[in-house]
């Protein structure tokens, strides 16, 4: 458990780096998945209205829009804290400021934080039960995490830690603690990857099983990212493939798919376009996650799609090592290696290839 005073001392002594002793506070009660209540048409309509407003194409940030988002989203937390989409509302509200990237509009980030903080205070006072209070406190933690991510000074980091610890101590907070602890890990990672790894190492033993599982997955990714991603196999056409041969030349996109998942099969069509458009910048490798008995169907898809790039098919199914190594448990899915062979994007889809290549510094 981290105390406020200990956290402050360690933050100051490490010049705003996160300290190794950054332990998460245990939740007030053991984690348990509460049964979701029956669907409420009124609630679902309210959630739909919020998501439509939040994801409105071309919406321009402004104080008026912020007010609309807050009035549409914040009351849902206290009213429907156990709704399956409450966590998503918290996430959508929590990342509003991060989506403001136009330099001329950057001052609006502070406007958003101010308006949301005021709304959180009012919502917490109006919450009538522990679950509602926990949901509002989760939003407070999400907002503090967002400020810490964008500001990164000792006060914002300390404030985020305090909000998360308060959420952990709140009855009902265990429903939301995993998201906020892992968000805090991302904040710390931007300041000190080594400190983030120490924090995740501690979180993997947390009594909240969801949090412990996510921390374990994150640790696996952190470990993979320490060295170039090793990938060497013989493709279905008999040709050898070794990712090491591409280092310094191309990025690599890993496409995970299964014959039973239509979306992952359709992604071959998008990848064919990328293969011809970006073949000088990226190598595509498809990794099949079907069991051995489905090999005939797998071969048929590869033949019908007229795939030109390497195909890894070993019949291991979802237990394939190249998938398990980076926590791939479902399809469609993907990942990207940069030109140095390092895991750059643990989760990626075909339509993201161009954007990620630009982030890696490839010229178009």
Spans of model-derived segments:
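Bacterial N-terminal signal peptides
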Residues: 9-21
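N-terminal leader/linker segments that initiate helical-solenoid repeat arrays
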Residues: 25-75, 79-84
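Helix-turn-helix repeat elements of alpha-solenoid scaffolds
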Residues: 61-72, 106-119, 151-162, 190-195
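Short solvent-exposed coil/turn linkers within tandem alpha-helical repeat scaffolds
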Residues: 79-87, 99-106, 119-155, 166-178, ...
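N-proximal helix/coil linker or "cap" segments that precede and/or mark the start of modular domains
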Residues: 186-234, 244-248, 296, 300-303
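Short active-site neighborhood of thiol/selenol oxidoreductases, capturing the structured segment around
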Residues: 242-265
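Structural microenvironment flanking redox-active thiols in thiol-disulfide oxidoreductases
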Residues: 263-305, 315-324
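Thiol/disulfide oxidoreductase modules built on the thioredoxin-like
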Residues: 305-307, 314-359
